[in-house]
Amino acid sequence: MDKFRVQGPTRLQGEVTISGAKNAALPILFSALLAEEPVEIQNVPKLKDIDTTMKLLSQLGAKVERNGSVWIDAGPVDVFCAPYDLVKTMRASIWALGPLVARFGQGQVSLPGGCAIGARPVDLHISGLEQLGAEIKLEEGYVKASVSGRLKGAHIVMDKVSVGATVTIMSAATLAEGTTIIENAAREPEIVDTANFLNALGAKITGQGSDRITIEGVQRLGGGVYRVLPDRIETGTFLVAAAISGGKILCRNAQPDTLDAVLAKLRDAGADIETGEDWISLDMHGNRPKAVNVRTAPHPGFPTDMQAQFTLLNLVAEGTGVITETIFENRFMHIPELIRMGAHAEIESNTAICHGVKQLSGAQVMATDLRASASLVLAGCIAEGTTIVDRIYHIDRGYERIEDKLQALGANIQRVKGE
């Protein structure tokens, strides 16, 4: 398995170009199954999960090509089962189910894999599709959905806010007969982006970005061209990289209005921040950040995917900061690794109390999930000495060329190829 070797400490400064959002690109790629004509999707990041999705769409019979953009022609799809060997590495595969049953009247997806953070059940996806008229069976490790004729529009009140289930219901409802209303819908920018993509193909979706989404079913979706929005979590990660090192950064191809909660906390930490239509700059003027209190919440609250990075910020900040994780259980797995590097923290159920130290020291650490591993790499950039980050396949699932981008900011980081 590959590792990163990071030599520190370094002050990170310079420019970085942000990639397209993985968490928008994935639902958009799966939603392309609804289209009877070819679609071109631009600004798709080059990541393992994206490659897996393209392979999965090909196995279903779609024509998939990548040359700059990703081109998908789902016209010839004639296989309706997403097999275990592809699904096991990526839980996003469940997003194939709604489009398959909506367009072809049948679909099966193996129960998914992915990051090891907490329980992420598929129940909400299943109950949403059932309310649209699909018959669901769980057999031999597969979720099997079928419907005779078209799905039927429904008024669906979601038990809890779920990004994944909102995508499933919204995409399936585009081809349902009648109108579907989703109450307590997720409001994330990636949901808005997926809805805008579907509308570009001829869907009739309104209210995306609010907690009430309305979908008027249409007979078919055509082709189109769409550009995926920038990755707000990658943007936030690089802003934190500059903040913890007293540095200065300009993020290009960014979308500031998707990061309000994160930018507010960075300002609280003492960062000087400016924004334009598609850029964000941060300058610490060489200062250490101040500790901040963070409580994760569904959008527009503070994103759980930025929690590990802000935990690290607090661990090297002036003062004490409290991090409360309300979205996923089991999401402080990076803290014991950071303690090996000299950090001071206590964990009490879903709360981490972080006492800032002036300097971390390099150590051998192990990545456990995607965002936790990013925080370990950033810790290595500012720690005294050498840090080895093991199991970095987690990082490759969510960050495009993170080592190249960090090197451009002055980091001393190398990928060490595994045996």
Swiss-Prot record:
CDD domains: UdpNAET. GO terms for molecular function: UDP-N-acetylglucosamine 1-carboxyvinyltransferase activity. Keywords: Cell cycle, Cell division, Cell shape, Cell wall biogenesis/degradation, Cytoplasm, Peptidoglycan synthesis, Pyruvate, Transferase. GO terms for biological process: cell division; cell wall organization; peptidoglycan biosynthetic process; regulation of cell shape; UDP-N-acetylgalactosamine biosynthetic process. The keyword Repressor does not apply. GO terms for cellular component: cytoplasm. Pathway: Cell wall biogenesis; peptidoglycan biosynthesis. Phosphoenolpyruvate binds at residues 22-23. It is found in: Cytoplasm. The keyword Endoplasmic reticulum does not apply. The modification 2-(S-cysteinyl)pyruvic acid O-phosphothioketal is found at residue 115. Its EC number is 2.5.1.7. InterPro entries: Enolpyruvate_Tfrase_dom (IPR001986), Enolpyruvate_Tfrase_sf (IPR036968), MurA_subfamily (IPR050068), RNA3'P_cycl/enolpyr_Trfase_a/b (IPR013792), UDP_GlcNAc_COvinyl_MurA (IPR005750). Belongs to the EPSP synthase family. MurA subfamily. Cell wall formation. Adds enolpyruvyl to UDP-N-acetylglucosamine. NCBIfam families: murA (TIGR01072), PRK09369.1 (NF006873). This is UDP-N-acetylglucosamine 1-carboxyvinyltransferase. It comes from Klebsiella pneumoniae subsp. pneumoniae (strain ATCC 700721 / MGH 78578).
